[in-house]
């Protein structure tokens, strides 16, 4: 995994970094209803897996925003070239395990690869993620049983800096189908403008999925 250290002497958000890093709860989060009308039609027409299709769009969108690829290590910031997703996979006993996926490939290849990795993850059946391997992850989850307007996520102490992205049950409003998508980020790295950029990128990925 390629990465670089940011120069803290020239980092333009140094004051913001220091301030938000000092807080006991340094996170900023929001939930936005994302239009998936056309995407859902494509999923149904091509018999695509809903979760993995959305996960691919989310992964591509997040990686388009540099701040979503940045992590705090000690008192410094590293920026990864590409971040993988770590998502929950439902198990037959009602629990779940974690599965790591790399979205840096064409969508047609990703769907085959991701389905295979999910089956392998079920056999491993673990939620352990330790050491440096966790830094380059985007934490992904879903709540497919309910539509919601806000979401509170569990976070560690001390705070980590991995973005958490979750979506719920899609619903119809008028002639559009909407999906609630939540984002939680460390405010020392990510401001509202960067979160807005993620949602714009997500709209773009949804519009153009499969055109790579």
Task: Put a short name on every predicted segment.
Residues 3-6, 21-53, 69-83, 137-140, ...:
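Gly/Ser/Thr-rich phosphate-binding loops and adjoining beta-strand/alpha-helix segments
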Residues 39-64, 179-198:
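Acyl activation and transfer enzymes in specialized metabolism, enriched
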Residues 91-146:
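Helical lid/core segments from catalytic subdomains that handle acyl or acyl-like groups
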Residues 132-145, 163-200:
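Histidine-centered acyl-transfer/condensation active-site motif
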């Amino acid at each position: 995994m390629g990465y670089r250290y940011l120069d803290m002497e020239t980092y333009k958000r140094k004051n913001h970094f220091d301030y938000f890093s000092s807080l006991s709860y340094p996170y900023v989060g929001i939930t936005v209803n994302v239009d998936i009308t056309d995407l859902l039609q494509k999923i149904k027409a091509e018999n695509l897996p809903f979760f993995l299709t959305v996960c691919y769009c989310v992964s591509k969108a997040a990686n388009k925003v540099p701040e979503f690829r940045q992590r705090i290590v000690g008192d410094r910031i590293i920026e990864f070239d590409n971040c993988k997703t770590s998502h929950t996979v439902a198990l037959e006993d009602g629990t779940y395990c974690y599965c790591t996926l790399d979205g840096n490939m064409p969508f047609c290849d990703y769907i085959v690869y991701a389905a295979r990795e999910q089956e392998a993850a079920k056999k491993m059946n673990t939620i352990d993620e330790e050491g440096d391997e966790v830094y380059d992850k985007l934490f992904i989850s879903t709540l497919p049983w309910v539509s919601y307007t806000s979401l509170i996520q569990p976070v560690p102490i001390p705070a980590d800096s991995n973005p958490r992205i979750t979506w719920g049950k899609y619903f119809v409003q008028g002639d559009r189908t909407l999906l609630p998508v939540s984002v939680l980020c460390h405010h020392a790295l990510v401001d509202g403008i960067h979160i807005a950029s993620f949602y714009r990128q997500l709209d773009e990925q949804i519009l153009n999925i499969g055109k790579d």
